[in-house]
Structures are given as structure tokens and as C-alpha cells.
């Protein structure tokens, strides 16, 4: 842990600066607003000590701490001892104390609520913890999905180890993930079953959550007869779309080794192939969180193949986050920037793009019109019109 510097007599340092002729340093120090300087130091210390939060979140997901609190009922708060009692085979007598310290940290980030009550005969206080509004996204909903798997993926060993190669990648080039593991992330999935399971779960959960919101808000699926989902995985996205628009014939397009595990879905045909070679014909093409995996050069190949597969007036429906051109300090801006640097570290040329960059890609691929339609759960639904 970082040690906060102290001085038995702060004026000694200032007097020494004056005696040594460093009056400029002395005057600068003397003129500082002590309260503002304290706040800056506190923020710097938070940055220096930020690793425990994501790691505690990962452990909370693995232990299902938030799920245990949720099971107790709406607005209920539980003590760390009560939560520890619900853990399987919790034989560690220190578990309640450890959980209390972890949950305290989560409370400082507004992930959980906390109420301190009188400890009675034991003295001190007993803290009870409940779910803050954001916590619902880390507890499985009625569809069995949450963002918990995304935390397990990003804080898992395979991705964490890659960050150790970031400095080397900046100085020498290359992708940190490839440098550490000796292969691209999509190839690595085939060598690590546990990583592959977590990766697929994280993608499925996030996609399930967002596609339902997209279908409710975006009206551009109307009048589509044949919709091709490029990189559609096991077809879950098309399942949601076609269940809301039964007249649509869905074509789930992905690599052959992916679609061979795809389940039978009414109204959906699974087609194997390579999007860099060709894409099945349709009057509309859907791509969600696909372009951000690839470099501009790769994206142009994909989009040009989309253009060839569309009739006149056909469209590509692109769902991606939009990078903000100037950095902001909002939660959304931070989330997108974090994902962007994550893509830089883990993927083969992937990046988050600004709206202007998406428009440039659309025009370079030959599309006549670029139309940002609506914003849904951190994502923009954009149409590239032929």
C-alpha cells in the first residue's frame, strides 16, 4: 500500500527552501489552496490504488454476493456474516470480516448500499449491505443474463496477463494479447475451453440485453424480408428479431465451426462462410459489435462485401458504440474509452470509432447515405444505405 508522507514540522521544509535560495518553490507551495491540493492528492491516491475495485468486483461475481443479497428480497440489507453463511462450504472463520471489507469498498463505488447499526453487546457497529441501482446489471435477470460474465472475462487471467505486454507493444509494435499468448484472441479461444466459455457467455449476455432494447426502439426492421446477421454466432440475436418480426427470413452467417453448434431456430437459416470472402444476399444486413473487432482495412473488406450482397436501396444496420471526439468525464465516455483501449490490447486491430469515422468507412465502401438512427443502451444504431 502507498504510504502517505508526513512531516513533524512542515515549516522546516519551507524554511530550508528559503535558506537554499529556492524561493520560487517556496512561493509556489505557499500560494497553493490547501483544500484543493488535498483533493488532488486524494484523487491521485485513488488512481494509484485502483486495482482492488475491479478484482473485488470479480470475486463478488464469482461468489454471487450480489445474488445472495437479491435473493433476500427487495430493499433487504444483509450483514457480512449473513452473506457468509449463504456461501457454499465457507469454512473460513475470517470470511465475514473479509466480506465486510470487500462490500465496504463496493459501497464506496455505489455498487451496494450500506447502513451501519449498533453492534450491541459486541460493541462497535454492524454494517448491513443492500443492492444499489447499478447492481441489478450484475445479477442474473429473467433471461438469465447479466454483465457479471463480462467482468469475469476482462479480469480473467487471459486478458489480465496481456496488459503486461502493453509497454512493449507501444515501443515495438504488435498486439499485447498476441505477444503474451503467441496467437490472436479468436484462435486462443480454441485452446482454452474455460476462456472460450466465459468469452461466449459474456458476449451472449450483453447481446441478449441490448438486442431486446434495440428491437423495442429501432423501427428499421419493418418491411425487411431477408435479414443477414453477419457474425451472428449461434443465432440468438436473430431469434429475438424474428420473434418480434415473424415475416423476416433470418440468415445467421458466421464461420463454419461456429454455426455447427447453432440450435434450430424457427425462421432462421444458419450459413457458414468467411465474411472477408463473401456475404449472403439479403435486402438488409445486420452487424452488432463486429466492426470494432477489426482495423479500418478489414472493415472496408467486410463493408464492400455487404455492398455487393445488397439490392439497390438496401441497407446495413450497424450497432456500435460511438467514440466521443473530445474526452469527457461521464460514465459513458469512460466506458467507451476503456473498451477502446481494451480492443487495442486484446484484438487484431480493433477500435472504437467516432461517428465521423463510421461515416468515412461507409462512404469509402460505396454507400450513398449514412444515417445515425437512435441511441440504445450505450450503442448507436446506424444505417449505411446503398
UniProtKB/Swiss-Prot annotation:
S-adenosyl-L-homocysteine binds at residues 207, 231, 254, 274, 288. The keyword Methyltransferase applies. The active site is at residue 292. The keyword Methyltransferase applies. Pathway: Aromatic compound metabolism; Alkaloid biosynthesis. It comes from the Eukaryota. It is an enzyme of class 2 (transferase). Keywords: Alkaloid metabolism, Methyltransferase, S-adenosyl-L-methionine, Transferase. S-adenosyl-L-methionine binds at residue 254. It catalyses: dopamine + S-adenosyl-L-methionine = 4-methoxytyramine + S-adenosyl-L-homocysteine + H(+); 3,4-dihydroxy-5-methoxyphenethylamine + S-adenosyl-L-methionine = 3-hydroxy-4,5-dimethoxyphenethylamine + S-adenosyl-L-homocysteine + H(+); 3-hydroxy-4,5-dimethoxyphenethylamine + S-adenosyl-L-methionine = mescaline + S-adenosyl-L-homocysteine + H(+); 4-hydroxy-3,5-dimethoxyphenethylamine + S-adenosyl-L-methionine = mescaline + S-adenosyl-L-homocysteine + H(+). Its EC number is 2.1.1.-. Belongs to the class I-like SAM-binding methyltransferase superfamily. Cation-independent O-methyltransferase family. Homodimer. O-methyltransferase participating in the biosynthesis of natural products derived from phenylethylamine, including mescaline, a natural hallucinogen potentially used in psychotherapeutic treatments. Catalyzes the O-methylation of mescaline para hydroxyl groups, using dopamine, 3,4-dihydroxy-5-methoxyphenethylamine, 3-hydroxy-4,5-dimethoxyphenethylamine and 4-hydroxy-3,5-dimethoxyphenethylamine as substrates. This is O-methyltransferase 10. It comes from Lophophora williamsii (Peyote).
Amino acid at each position: 500500500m502507498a504510504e502517505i508522507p508526513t512531516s513533524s514540522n512542515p515549516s522546516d521544509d519551507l524554511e530550508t527552501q528559503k535558506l537554499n535560495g529556492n524561493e520560487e518553490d517556496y512561493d509556489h507551495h505557499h500560494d497553493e489552496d490547501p483544500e484543493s491540493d488535498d483533493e488532488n492528492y486524494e484523487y491521485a491516491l485513488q488512481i494509484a490504488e485502483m486495482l482492488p475495485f475491479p478484482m473485488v468486483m470479480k470475486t463478488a461475481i464469482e461468489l454471487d454476493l450480489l445474488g445472495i443479497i437479491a435473493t433476500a428480497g427487495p430493499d433487504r440489507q444483509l450483514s457480512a456474516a449473513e452473506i457468509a453463511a449463504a456461501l457454499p462450504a465457507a469454512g473460513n472463520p475470517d470470511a465475514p470480516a473479509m466480506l465486510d471489507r470487500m462490500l465496504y469498498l463496493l459501497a464506496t463505488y455505489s455498487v451496494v448500499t450500506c447502513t451501519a447499526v449498533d453492534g450491541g453487546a459486541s460493541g462497535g457497529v454492524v454494517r448491513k449491505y443492500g443492492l444499489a441501482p447499478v447492481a441489478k446489471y450484475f445479477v442474473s435477470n429473467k433471461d438469465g443474463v447479466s454483465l457479471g460474465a463480462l467482468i469475469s472475462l476482462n479480469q480473467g487471467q487471459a486478458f489480465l496477463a496481456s496488459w503486461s505486454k502493453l509497454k512493449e507493444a507501444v515501443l515495438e509494435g504488435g498486439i499485447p494479447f498476441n505477444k503474451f499468448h503467441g496467437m490472436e484472441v479468436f484462435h486462443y479461444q480454441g485452446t482454452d475451453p474455460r476462456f472460450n466459455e466465459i468469452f461466449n457467455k459474456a458476449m451472449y449476455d450483453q447481446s441478449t440485453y441490448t438486442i431486446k432494447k434495440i428491437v423495442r426502439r429501432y423501427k428499421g426492421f419493418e418491411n425487411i424480408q431477408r435479414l443477414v446477421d453477419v457474425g451472428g454466432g449461434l443465432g440468438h440475436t436473430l431469434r429475438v428479431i424474428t420473434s418480434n418480426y415473424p415475416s423476416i427470413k433470418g440468415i445467421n452467417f458466421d464461420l463454419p465451426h461456429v454455426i455447427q453448434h447453432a440450435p434450430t431456430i424457427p425462421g432462421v437459416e444458419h450459413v457458414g462462410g468467411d465474411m472477408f470472402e463473401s456475404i449472403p444476399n439479403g435486402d438488409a444486413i445486420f452487424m452488432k459489435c463486429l466492426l470494432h473487432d477489426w482495423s479500418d482495412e478489414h472493415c472496408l473488406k467486410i463493408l464492400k462485401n455487404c455492398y455487393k450482397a445488397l439490392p439497390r436501396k438496401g441497407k446495413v444496420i450497424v450497432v456500435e458504440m460511438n467514440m466521443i471526439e473530445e474526452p469527457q468525464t461521464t460514465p459513458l465516455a469512460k466506458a467507451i474509452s476503456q473498451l477502446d483501449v481494451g480492443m487495442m490490447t486484446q484484438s487484431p486491430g480493433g477500435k472504437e470509432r467516432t461517428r465521423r469515422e463510421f461515416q468515412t468507412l461507409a462512404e469509402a465502401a460505396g454507400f450513398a447515405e449514412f444515417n445515425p438512427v437512435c441511441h440504445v443502451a450505450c450503442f448507436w444504431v446506424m444505417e449505411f444505405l446503398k
